[in-house]
Regions:
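Flexible phosphate-sensing "switch/lid" loops adjacent to ATP/NTP-binding sites
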Residues: 1, 20
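A short, compositionally biased
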Residues: 49-56
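ATP-dependent carboxylate-amine ligase
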Residues: 4, 23-30, 38, 52, ...
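Conserved beta-strand-loop-beta-strand element in the redox core of flavoprotein oxidoreductases
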Residues: 56-62
Length: 248
């Protein structure tokens, strides 16, 4: 559906990049590539240096070195930043891009929002990923959660159904159990029929509770999780997890 004079943004680290490049060339499209490691790409991430709550990040863009300040809560979204820069340089000159281009960008609610939940003497850190879920976004969110709180012994996840996967639903819900089993999550709680397939493939010591309704979810959060825990909640928007979190 790309017009003949259009552009195609391609991740050069992706295993299908050569396929997409060949297709784009056949259509005579403008090709812009990005990469975290391949310096032959048009937009390349070269490194970072931390300064308090932000990072000074170095990029190679169309052969020119460019620096941008990135907030610490965005530093794990490197592919998103690279693809955004690729789109921007298709329309604007590199020199016109300010260093603080990304500095005031805020993550949309329920796409990794951090909630400091307090109930009496109990304090929890909730990472709200309840806007949507698919195997790729689940793995990304899980890896980031595991990394950001690697020193904690109180890491929990609550997962809801990944919807709109069609005939592959069962297979893909089983697949994400492999990601969880390789992580350092303490317990995994599930909500929804498809997530039971995930639950059954988890290591026994990583299995938490199978939750059946809103009341059981609220009871888990308010009463059962230990103080100073970290909880990531991930599921498709229509599972209702999003509404439950909003009303905490």
């Amino acid at each position: 559906n790309i017009s003949p004079s259009g552009a195609m943004i391609i991740n050069k680290d992706d295993k299908y990049c050569n396929y997409f490049i060949s297709k784009a060339k056949m259509r005579n499209l403008n090709i812009i590539t990005f990469s975290k490691k391949n310096k032959s790409a048009d937009v390349v991430y070269l490194g970072e240096r931390k300064n308090r709550n932000k990072f000074l990040c170095k990029f190679l863009i169309k052969g020119k070195i460019k620096f941008f300040l990135i907030p610490d809560y965005l530093i794990d979204f490197k592919e998103n930043i690279l693809s955004t820069l690729s789109i921007i340089v298709n329309y604007f000159y590199i020199d016109a891009l300010p260093t603080n281009l990304f500095l005031n960008f805020k993550i949309s609610k329920s796409r990794g929002t951090i909630i400091r939940y307090k109930n009496g003497k109990k304090n929890l850190t909730i990472i709200d990923e309840s806007y949507n879920s698919n195997p790729l976004s689940f793995k990304f969110a899980l890896d980031r959660f595991d990394k950001n709180y690697k020193n904690s012994k109180k890491k929990f996840i609550l997962i809801g159904n990944m919807l709109e996967l069609g005939k592959f639903s069962k297979k893909l819900h089983i697949k994400i159990a492999k990601y969880i089993n390789k992580s350092k999550i303490n317990k995994t709680h599930v909500y929804g029929n498809y997530t039971k397939h995930t639950f059954n493939k988890l290591k026994p010591q990583m299995r938490g509770k199978i939750l059946n309704n809103k009341l059981e979810i609220l009871n888990l959060i308010k009463k059962q999780l230990p103080n100073n825990s970290f909880l990531m909640i991930k599921g498709s928007n229509s599972t209702g997890l999003n509404k439950i979190i909003k009303n905490l």
